[in-house]
């Protein structure tokens, strides 16, 4: 005799908490690389985001009269906090991070009904909110440690985040200076600014910050997230289609752009290993709630993100484009899933 159970018949043995913890664990190589090259700021921001996210989650659940402990223990709010902390500049003022994190949990997540019902990726909603509201602070990244004019320890990072000045009294504007006395920016930001000033790609990329595939420090940060992403694929936490489609389409678009206008476009390898490329491809775009769920839909979704990232980086007003690309793709998910839904056996074609 066979026991016939009710649908659904396909099950994922990994519980939500386990999946979230695996994703957080996979972030560690990238976090370690960020800490090594850019100081302790990201670590402090993650801790602050965790406190804010869990507090906001508990507050909303209490107001909605929902069980608090199970929701706090499922790891979803913690993962959102980690992704926000990793995405923001390490020395962003504390109140901006608190504002963005609270907005992600209260508005982007619970306004739509909570876990499993949000249309947009909460971490990217927070990022875009802060980028549009505070563009100067959101583009204030430190130079990598090898070309930084001032050493910044844990105490200095905490002091800048909470007071705006290091323990020695240096402001953020001073800390952004490189050893040559010039104010530094991320490789993507430096490239965008240089091209807008009429310089060629070769002239811009002669700057010291462009050492390596994606710039000093950024190549290693992206390699760290690539390593974490491969771990998630090996553990079957994420599907290969979304990151594969993103990286493949970004590589193809960047290659075509470079072949057509080499003096106005960065190399394909630069696009793959700079900015938030690997973090976005493996950890952000693969959010199971806001991403496409059909096999073909995941490929379309990933290609859309990859192409949008290149187009916004090349022609848009923001140096890195992953947050905007992911949110625009999230908006298209219902249509993508509708058009790529597998056919039901025996159903009539309309």
Curated annotation (Swiss-Prot):
Quaternary state and partners of this protein?
A: The complex is composed of six subunits: RnfA, RnfB, RnfC, RnfD, RnfE and RnfG.
Which residues are modified to FMN phosphoryl threonine? 186
Q: What gene is behind this protein?
A: rnfD
Question: Where on the tree of life does the source sit, at the highest rank?
Answer: Bacteria
Q: How does it sit in the membrane?
A: Multi-pass membrane protein
Q: What is its EC number?
A: 7.-.-.-
According to its UniProt record, which cofactors does this protein need?
FMN
Give the function comment from the record: Part of a membrane-bound complex that couples electron transfer with translocation of ions across the membrane.
Where found in the cell? Cell inner membrane
Entry keyword Nucleotide-binding: no
* Enzyme class per UniProt: translocase
Protein's recorded name: Ion-translocating oxidoreductase complex subunit D
């Amino acid at each position: 005799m066979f026991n016939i159970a009710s649908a659904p018949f396909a099950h994922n043995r990994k519980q939500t908490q386990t999946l979230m913890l695996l994703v957080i664990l996979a972030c560690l190589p990238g976090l370690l690389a960020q800490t090594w090259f850019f100081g302790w700021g990201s670590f402090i921001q993650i801790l602050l985001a965790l406190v804010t996210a869990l507090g906001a989650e508990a507050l909303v659940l209490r107001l909605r009269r929902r069980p608090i402990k199970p929701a706090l223990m499922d790891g979803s709010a913690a993962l959102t906090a980690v992704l926000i902390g990793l995405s923001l500049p390490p020395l962003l003022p504390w109140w901006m991070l608190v504002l963005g994190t609270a907005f992600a949990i209260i508005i982007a997540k619970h306004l739509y009904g909570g876990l499993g019902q949000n249309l947009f990726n909460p971490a990217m909603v927070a990022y875009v909110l802060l980028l549009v509201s505070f563009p100067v602070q959101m583009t204030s990244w430190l130079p990598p440690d090898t070309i930084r004019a001032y050493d910044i320890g844990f105490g200095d990072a905490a002091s800048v985040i909470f007071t705006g000045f290091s323990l020695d009294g240096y402001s953020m504007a001073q800390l952004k200076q490189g050893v040559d006395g010039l104010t530094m920016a991320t490789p993507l930001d430096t490239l965008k600014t240089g091209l807008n000033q009429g310089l060629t790609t070769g002239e811009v990329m002669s700057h010291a910050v462009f050492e390596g595939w994606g710039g000093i420090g950024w190549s290693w940060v992206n390699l760290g997230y690539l390593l974490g992403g491969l771990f998630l694929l090996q553990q079957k936490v994420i599907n290969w289609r979304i990151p594969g489609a993103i990286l493949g389409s970004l590589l193809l678009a960047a290659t075509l752009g470079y072949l057509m206008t080499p003096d106005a476009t960065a190399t394909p390898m630069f696009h793959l290993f700079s900015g938030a490329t690997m973090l976005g491809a493996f950890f952000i775009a693969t959010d199971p709630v806001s991403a496409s769920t059909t096999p073909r839909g995941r490929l379309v979704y990933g290609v859309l993100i990859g192409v949008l990232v290149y187009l916004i980086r090349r022609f848009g007003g923001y140096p890195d484009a992953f947050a905007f690309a992911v949110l625009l793709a999230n908006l298209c998910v219902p249509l993508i899933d509708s058009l790529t839904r597998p056919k039901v056996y025996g159903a009539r074609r309309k």
